[in-house]
């Protein structure tokens, strides 16, 4: 547990976990990061260094009631299963880049990664930066990138997201982008946002299998290796069993 800390003016991540729980057995990490003030991070390495990074394929971690602010790239990154992110405040993030988000997750071609919750957070003053006189593009408060599936995003407040379309349209700037399927987005409040919600079919949808279930269109998953070797893959009903 990391709680009640003030973390600031660090060269890379404010908090980084290399391993969070057991991905194959779904044994939770029980990591809790709470009540921290994290700001002015990524002072030396400016991209993909965040206030909180739960690491790759994390299981059962919690980020609660933290204030993450004043960062050049993402405020928080997570991947995995059964993570809970609530009561946090995110602001003045992604100040030096485009195509990044305050809270970024990438389930990518892992559609059995379910049970993640993002709720009761406050996102504000994001996507308003000008880089060498050019407006940002493709910046969101929350993004489930590359076909992220099965996330629950609810009861969050989004305020002052974007520059009011002063660039080219909304510049791809807004509150939520959910690029996959089976994402539940409800009871959120959007105030003064360029755009509230966007879903894209830019990435190939999960394909139907012969037995009426679904499977991802990647070599690793078509072979059944990942699905067969994770409890979550075995128990998710809409995925093909190899």
Locations of regions flagged by a protein language model:
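Sequence context of c-type cytochrome heme-c attachment sites
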Residues: 106
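C-terminal low-complexity, glycine/proline- and small-hydrophobic-enriched intrinsically disordered tails
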Residues: 230-240
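Short glycine/acidic-rich loop motifs that flank beta-strands on beta-rich extracellular proteins
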Residues: 11-17, 26, 42-50, 72-79, ...
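Asp-box/WD-like beta-propeller blade repeats and closely related beta-sheet repeat scaffolds
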Residues: 20-21
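Right-handed parallel beta-helix
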Residues: 1-12, 26-42, 59-72, 81-95, ...
